[in-house]
């Protein structure tokens, strides 16, 4: 609460009520190929077990992913083998474990809502809290021609930033040897209080996935977004 990035965390008393970021990962152990599909959090869909269409992030209930899993299967025909919820604290731990993640910027950027502040163009290294402020930013502004302007895109631009940050984090993890089984085990144990996963996604299974990721070129991770168009629904964009 004393961090200048506290707004990026939102109201922690309500954490888990809605998902902030939804991604489907496909990891192929045989080919070491990884694909990531992101869903806009404000995408309107028919929520499983409910009559009206709502934002997809409302399908998630605190530590209970089944409704979200069912919604994705019903709406997109995608089956889910495993589920993992990573909260803000686990995200921060991961970024700090590799001494931060560097991201290049052509111009200064900020988001007064999350506390994001990159004061000058160039390569900026984000540590835990500030990294969260960056990936959660929805009202990012750039400083150009002597003034701040909001022209950094919509939720799709936010998804692109998140996917790019994943690649850069993977690069940092590989460089730090963080996919080594002993390091992965330590990271998982350190973040255990901040991670929720299905019963079949055991520690050994996580280590198996880490072994696959160790052989993946982050630049070769394929990323996709669910196509959607902007529309005002019930007074909201």
Residue locations for each model-derived region?
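Extracytoplasmic
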Residues: 17-22, 31-39, 51-53, 67, ...
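Second-shell loop/turn segments in exported
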Residues: 9-13, 53-62, 77-82, 121, ...
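Soluble non-cytosolic domains of exported or imported proteins
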Residues: 15-19, 50, 58-67, 85-89, ...
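Entry/capping segment at the start of metal-dependent catalytic domains
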Residues: 1-32
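Amphipathic, coiled-coil-like alpha-helical scaffolding segments used for oligomerization/assembly
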Residues: 57-121, 200-206, 210, 216
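Sec-exported extracytoplasmic/periplasmic mature domains
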Residues: 26-29, 44, 48, 61, ...
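C-terminal solvent-exposed extensions
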Residues: 3-5, 52, 126, 190, ...
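Flexible, polar/acidic helix-loop-strand segments at domain edges
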Residues: 94-182
